[in-house]
From Swiss-Prot:
Residues 1-31, 157-289, 852-910 are annotated as: Disordered. It comes from Aedes aegypti. InterPro entries: EIF3C (IPR027516), EIF3C_N_dom (IPR008905), PCI_dom (IPR000717), WH_DNA-bd_sf (IPR036390). The gene is eIF3-S8. Residues 641-817 form the PCI domain. Belongs to the eIF-3 subunit C family. This is Eukaryotic translation initiation factor 3 subunit C. GO terms for molecular function: RNA binding; translation initiation factor activity; translation initiation factor binding. It comes from the Eukaryota.
Length: 910
């Protein structure tokens, strides 16, 4: 063994001494233990370092999981983070005085933003796996609960998120110091092991000058020499395997200082060279945008600026519009600079109008996705530019901005100035962007209120465009801009209309109804397309119904025949039709026309999807019922929140109207087997309540209406009105009406009347006669009203009775069968049907395979039996004839019984 090691040492000496030959490293260092392992001191870390390192590692894992959207692993890491933070709380309390370290707050803020972003991306959530989707919901709930303790810290962090983390700086300094210590502590023998690291450093710094290269390579040669010297310095195996060899401390310290100085000099030279490169004009090129060389340049310093030059430059800038690599933001800046140049050189209002119109178009083009709203900063700039453009057009009568003007015929220097463009299209796009901004905001937040304030500005812009279009005299464009004005006016309630009806205001006062009438009449007369006229009629009906002009709204509906042709219209027009019919039903209910209100609302409520039909939201459906594209299109059709109609109010009006119609009808046709349902929805609600074994006190609006219906069936109007009109129902429904007290009084009056009719229908077989004053006292109605109701019932043949005026009584005639008789007749009919069905089944089982001549023989045998009374037919035919005869006998017997009962009732009545 000793000879083997000695031989290895001599080989290394000989190979290291030869410079010309390149030979592999000797095998001797494989058996030497690096002094780095033995010489490194054991570092005792504090509790703070341990806890902070654990937190940092978990945060690093969370950031990695965020990149790949691994929600399951992120949930696990978040739970580990909470546990690690709990362990670190004593350290934070002691060292940081209870202040949470900034790197933890930064991680929580980043995680909160990430969770909110993923949660709001509904399309992306649908693409998540089932496990990730479930983990996302759990993570969101736990995170929202956990960060309540960090609200103040998060708020401070979001005020200055770019500030550096103190703990991270300390850790970086510590890591640098530790790395320097490792470099200094390592002995010369370890340099052979770290040879590759030094080569890598040379590769990074090979771009420096030759002197740097020579210095680095000198260092490498020194290290090689030192390593070879170390390998030869051990004269025996014992010295080689000693834990620590003797070394010269003075030389080691000098080597450390020299190495540190060389590293510092190389870093300074590298920074200096990079700064020189930046000064020479290098720039970072973004692959998604065109470079500055590709962008159009402004005018030269001494160039002569005139109209043609500016227009040519404008065309050059706008030529890049719509191209893939065009920087839209830079394009808007170019146009604004061009406008400033035009204003400086006084090139005229026509050039300024042309440039402003192109700026408006460029702002519209900034957002490439049509379905998404534009940013708020662009929205505010858009409003400013359009207002300035319209103000410029109205101030100059000589400027004509029209899409019918060709580019070759544009005129900027002499009046009349002609510019190609369409201000109406820009305003229509502005209105659509305003609607998208409203739909994007949370309707219950202050942002929605702030955006809604912009409607005043948008309405004023439309009003100014109306003046400009009216000045041009184009009927088609006038109809279009009138319809935009109607869309902002038709759903708004004007209290001056009702004050004018009550003559509280002079007759010359102009109200929104007068303005709507003027605008709609113009569209009726001048529009050449059915769509604008249809939308104008529907908006007109909506506005009339909103202000209780029931008869005008009803006449417009009947004369326009929209209910027959609306199915061929586009979806937005159909949505407007549904909104109009809903508002018309509310108007009919306020006027006491319960039947008309029910007819207007039945089509909406029967489907069970009034929310979708009114474009006020999407109802969750199964996966295959609605695709992502359909859902996206339907979301674009949704109405802004401030234009919504209260769905609970609609449903309550529909159910109350159905109750007032259905309950008396059910009492009048209690034993009618062919009774039809007036309202299927109300009938289902009533039946589902009756099927319940235990019914508690009503809580929801539907339960109140069902409880009121049950009370009305017994003629208890007081309990019925209590269920319909109470504090809870007032807050939910009735207080939403204008003049709510009048609506409540009307409703109680109808409940009394329909309860009286139901009472007479239900208990008419109990009374022989009943006093009119008694009924008036029971239902708290005037005698004249009770007399009128009973007279109508007698005339319509709903109640078989007669009025005795001298005694003020109602004499009831029992022309209808009693309850027992009616049930007996129903039982006999059902038994007869059962016998017929059984015999039919028996014939099908036995068959008629042995009949002579098929159907012809069967008919001939039956005819012979009837004419000659011969019993020569088969048993099947005989049973058929016997059944027919028995059925005829039963019918005759029932007819005789009815006649006999009718005669007996008439005799008793006389």
């Amino acid at each position: 063994m000793s000879r083997f090691f000695a031989g290895g040492g001599s080989d290394s000496d000989s190979e290291s001494s030869s410079d010309s030959e390149v030979v592999a490293r000797p095998a001797a260092p494989q058996f030497t233990f690096s002094d780095e392992e033995e010489d490194v001191k054991r570092v005792v870390r504090s509790t703070k370092e341990k806890r902070y390192e654990d937190l940092s590692n978990i945060i690093k894992n969370i950031r990695n999981y965020k990149k790949i959207k691994d929600m399951s692993s992120m949930l696990t890491s978040f739970e580990e983070l909470t546990r690690a933070h709990t362990k670190a709380l004593p350290v934070i309390t002691k060292v940081e005085n209870g202040v949470t370290p900034r790197f933890i707050i930064r991680a929580l803020a980043e995680l909160e933003d990430f969770i909110n972003m993923v949660w709001e991306d509904k399309e992306g959530r649908k693409n998540l796996s089932k496990n990730n989707s479930k983990s996302l919901g759990t993570l969101r709930q736990k995170f929202r609960k956990y960060i309540k303790d960090f609200d103040s810290d998060l708020k401070k962090f979001r005020e200055s998120p770019d500030a550096a983390d103190d703990d991270e700086e300390e850790e970086e300094k510590k890591e640098e110091s530790e790395s320097e210590d490792e470099q200094h502590v390592a002995p010369a023998a370890a340099k052979a092991v770290s040879f590759k690291k030094e080569v890598k450093q040379v590769k990074v710094e090979k771009d420096d000058d030759e002197s740097d290269d020579s210095i680095d390579w000198d260092m490498d040669s020194d290290s090689d020499e030192s390593s070879s010297d170390e390998e030869t310095q051990y004269t025996s195996i014992r010295e080689r395997f000693l834990k620590k060899a003797e070394k010269d401390d003075g030389e080691d310290a000098e080597n450390k200082k020299e190495k540190k100085k060389l590293q510092k000099d190389s870093k300074d030279r590298l920074k200096k060279k990079r700064a020189e490169d930046d000064d020479e004009g290098w720039e970072v090129v973004n692959g998604n945008r065109s470079t500055s060389a590709e962008q159009p340049k402004m005018f030269a310093k001494d160039a002569e600026i005139d109209v043609n030059v500016v227009i040519n430059k404008l065309n050059e800038v706008m030529a890049a519009r719509g191209k893939k690599r065009t920087d839209r933001k830079l394009q808007i800046e170019f146009l604004r600079e061009l406008r400033t140049i035009a204003d400086t050189h006084n090139l005229g209002d026509a050039v300024a109008a042309k440039i402003r119109f192109n700026i408006v178009s460029a702002i519209f083009d900034y957002n490439p996705k049509v379905s998404e709203p534009m940013k708020l900063e662009h929205w505010s700039k858009l409003l400013e530019e359009i207002q300035a453009l319209i103000k410029l057009l109205l101030a100059n009568d000589d400027i004509v901005l029209s899409e019918t003007i060709l580019e070759e015929n544009e005129e900027y220097e002499t009046a009349p100035y002609k510019i190609r463009g369409c201000i109406l299209t820009a305003v229509e796009r502005l209105d659509d962007e305003f609607t998208k901004l409203l739909k994007e905001c949370d309707p219950h937040s202050n942002d929605y209120v702030d955006r809604l304030k912009d409607e005043v500005t948008v309405s004023s812009v439309i009003e100014q465009v109306v003046k400009y279009i009216e000045r041009l005299g184009n009927d088609t464009e006038t109809c279009r801009v009138y319809l935009r004005k109607i869309d902002h006016l038709y759903y708004k309630f004007d209290p001056n209309v009702l004050k004018k009806k009550k003559k509280e205001l002079p007759a010359s006062t102009l109200t929104s109804v007068d303005e709507m009438d003027r605008l709609c009449r113009f569209v009726y007369a001048k529009d050449q397309t059915d769509r604008l006229r249809t939308r104008a009629i529907l908006s007109h009906i909506f506005h009339h119904a909103l202000h209780d002009n029931w008869f005008q709204a009803r006449d417009l509906v009947l004369m326009s025949h929209l209910q027959e042709t609306i199915h061929h219209s586009d979806p937005p027009t159909q949505i407007l039709y549904n909104r109009t019919m809903a508002n018309l039903g509310l108007c009919a209910f306020r006027h006491g026309n319960v039947k008309d209100a029910h007819q207007c609302l039945v089509d909406l409520m029967m489907t069970g999807k009034p929310k979708e039909l009114l474009a006020q939201g999407l109802v969750p459906q199964r996966q295959n019922e609605r695709s992502l594209e359909q859902e996206k299109v339907e979301k674009q059709r949704q109405m802004p929140f401030h234009m919504h109609i209260n769905l609970e109010l609609l449903e309550c009006v529909y159910l109350v109207s159905a109750m007032l119609l259905e309950i008396p009808y059910m009492a009048a046709h209690e034993f009618d087997a062919r009774r039809r349902m007036i309202s299927k929805t109300f009938y289902q609600q009533l039946r589902s309540s009756e099927r319940q074994s235990l019914v508690g006190p009503p809580e929801s609006m539907r339960e109140h209406v069902v409880a009121a219906a049950k009370a009305m069936r017994h003629g208890n109007w007081n309990a019925c009105s209590t269920f319909i009109v109470n504090k809870k129902m007032n807050v939910k429904v009735w207080d939403l009406f204008y003049e709510a007290d009048r609506v409540r009084e009307m409703l109680i009056k109808f409940i009394k009347e329909e309860s009286l009719r139901t009472y007479l229908f239900t208990y008419s077989n109990v009374y022989a006669s009943i006093s009119v004053p008694y009924l008036a006292e029971m239902f708290e109605l005037p005698k004249s009203k009770v007399h009128s109701l009973i007279s109508k019932m007698i005339i319509n043949e709903e109640l078989m009775a007669s009025l005795d005026d001298p005694t003020e009584t109602v004499v009831l005639h029992r022309s209808e069968p009693s309850r027992l008789q009616a049930l007996s007749m129903q039982l006999s009919d059902k038994v007869t049907n059962l016998v017929d069905s059984n015999e039919r089944i028996f014939e099908m089982k036995q068959g008629n395979f042995f009949q002579r001549g098929g159907n012809q023989g069967y008919n001939r045998d039956r005819q012979n039996y009837r004419n000659q009374n011969q019993n020569q037919n088969w048993s099947g035919n005989r049973r058929q004839d016997n059944r027919e005869n028995r059925g005829n006998r039963n019918q005759n017997r029932d007819r005789d019984h009815r006649k006999q009962h009718r005669v007996e009732f008439e005799e008793k009545a006389e």
